[in-house]
Amino acid sequence: MKYHDLRDFLTLLEQQGELKRITLPVDPHLEITEIADRTLRAGGPALLFENPKGYSMPVLCNLFGTPKRVAMGMGQDDVSALRDVGKLLAFLKEPEPPKGFRDLFDKLPQFKQVLNMPTKRLRGAPCQQKIASGDDVDLTRLPIMTCWPDDAAPLITWGLTVTRGPHKERQNLGIYRQQLIDKNKLIMRWLSHRGGALDFQEWLAAHPGERFPISVALGADPATILGAVTPVPDTLSEYAFAGLLRGTKTEVVKCLSNDLEVPASAEIILEGYIEPGEMAPEGPYGDHTGYYNEVDNFPVFTVTHITQREDAIYHSTYTGRPPDEPAVLGVALNEVFVPILQKQFPEIVDFYLPPEGCSYRLAVVTMKKQYAGHAKRVMMGVWSFLRQFMYTKFVIVCDDDVNARDWNDVIWAITTRMDPARDTVLVDNTPIDYLDFASPVSGLGSKMGLDATNKWPGETQREWGRPIVKDPEVTARIDAIWDELAIFK
């Protein structure tokens, strides 16, 4: 599914009945959230609010409100095809040299895709068609949404933050929420382990007291947005990955006030800096847990330039108790994670992040168990292999005769194959999401692993139960007369 920018993608969605234009005036303060939430829960289309009250700029919401639209954004026709994206990422994470001519021929499609990695640098770009700087910078002209009644202030949610550490060629792209506190100031809420925050810390060490340049893209093309939330290998830039998804090189342009490169076709670009030591209290905000988070201090982003396209579109979302867009993204990206995990742990059969588990806080793994203690190895692997699962609190490991995506199966395995004392692993003092107020200390808490596999010798001293298996001859005889019985007619 080919598209060039966000506007191309919206045209594709509209052609397939996946976009609804709302002409009725609707307020970005709470009302858009209410409409978007009802629409998402019903599996409805992306929404383009053409007349937000008090603003001349339309608001796009629910862009990734169904797994199908996430797949479309990644250049695929359906969610199942995202396994192929995961296989490509697994290959790029640990590429294996061809073992011969036939193997080289088999790998040619992957190598061909890699050729689309480099970015294409432009001298001028649509995102710089209109420029505001100095006193003309006014973020209050943007239709920034207030999502929940007790939110502290309007909040930018889909901002693609672009940073670069002082000793790095590669830029980092991250999505961090940003609270509006003045006409030219936002609070950059990034956690200490995230790429943007790490770049900032390295900058402070290398250039003490100097301003840290930063840019934020709003309304980038879906491939670039999704590249920022996908487990891209450290050796691959998010722009390069977006090019792989799109099938064409990502076009970028140098910012006006710094050397950062931003998506050329983005709707809006915010350029500016973080002054070392300038912090502000952020929050509270309703979040993906279904609760308001605690107030905490984060750096202040001062905006010196706003550049944008003619007739720009403001892309936004809301987060709340699942289902919301992050939960839908989790369902779709789940399919990307499976091949990556399987490359490292071939014994894994399936991996599932239930959306009701707030996208990542609980994982179910099914595996082909091969030795005593094997389930615990996989459990530890899930927590440590990908950064995306650093905050996963619960990991349930089952045998391959269990359907990881069926709670009836999973609960049966837990209640019949587990001894709570023997098969529960508790790990204390581990990284935990700062939004998780259930942890005893902000950012630090425990994890639980549940080994719901059949136990091998060495794991138990008792004879293990024999599973009930139907007599196949009886099953065949009843199959032959089933329709004649007419039980459900």
UniProtKB/Swiss-Prot annotation:
UniProt KW keywords: Cell membrane, Decarboxylase, Flavoprotein, FMN, Lyase, Manganese, Membrane, Metal-binding, Ubiquinone biosynthesis
Pathway named in the protein's UniProt entry: Cofactor biosynthesis; ubiquinone biosynthesis
GO molecular function (one): 3-octaprenyl-4-hydroxybenzoate carboxy-lyase activity
Enzyme Commission code(s) on record: 4.1.1.98
GO BP annotations listed: ubiquinone biosynthetic process
Enzyme class name: lyase
Active-site residue list: D287 (proton donor)
Reaction(s) catalysed by this chain's protein: a 4-hydroxy-3-(all-trans-polyprenyl)benzoate + H(+) = a 2-(all-trans-polyprenyl)phenol + CO2
InterPro entries noted in UniProt: UbiD (IPR002830), UbiD-like_C (IPR049381), UbiD-like_N (IPR049383), UbiD_bacteria (IPR023677), UbiD_Rift_dom (IPR048304)
Residues the record lists as binding Mn(2+): N172, E238
Cofactor names: prenylated FMN; Mn(2+)
Principal subcellular localisation of the protein: membrane
PANTHER family for the chain: 3-OCTAPRENYL-4-HYDROXYBENZOATE CARBOXY-LYASE-RELATED, FERULIC ACID DECARBOXYLASE 1
Family per similarity comment: Belongs to the UbiD family.
Protein's name in the database: 3-octaprenyl-4-hydroxybenzoate carboxy-lyase
The gene coding this protein: ubiD
